[in-house]
Amino acid sequence: MVKLSLRTHPDVLFGFSNNYVELILRVENPGEHSVWTEADVAVPEHISLAPNNALRKGRIRVGIVAKNEFLEKAVRVYGNSYTQPQMYKCDITLYSFNRDGVIENRMEKSFNLRCEMKKEASL
């Protein structure tokens, strides 16, 4: 069974401006055989998976994770002028496939993305 952990870089998305954070998926495979992994990502309103339009769902092909190894894959989450400072709940569904192409495992995980006002530089 694979393990999924999530993090962002940078830690905070800034509100009311066009910027992005990278949501990084880390998939670990402690199992005895290699698996192919893909993930569905869903974001709420006012943030997007595309820089210029509203895209709320997407799929990431993480790749083949060999036994006792891990892979990391990043997806950009974009803010815009409608992105308010609050917590946004992102949903990730990870699928792992065996060598016959059959879904071996399905894992759902949520991640709270923090959005804040950008602090002005002070002297």
Each model region followed by its residue ranges:
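Beta-sheet-dominated interaction scaffolds and their linkers
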Residues: 1-30, 59-64
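Short glycine/proline/serine/threonine-rich loop/turn segments at secondary-structure transition edges
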Residues: 16, 81-91
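Short acidic, flexible loop segments centered on an aromatic residue
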Residues: 30-48
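Short acidic/proline- and small/hydrophobic-mixed sequence motifs that coincide with surface turns
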Residues: 31-37, 85-87, 104
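Short beta-strand and strand-turn-strand segments in soluble, beta-rich domains
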Residues: 46-61
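Short, hydrophobic beta-strand segments
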Residues: 73-82
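Enriched for extracellular/lumenal, surface-exposed ectodomains of secreted and cell-surface proteins
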Residues: 92-101
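Short beta-strand elements
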Residues: 102-123
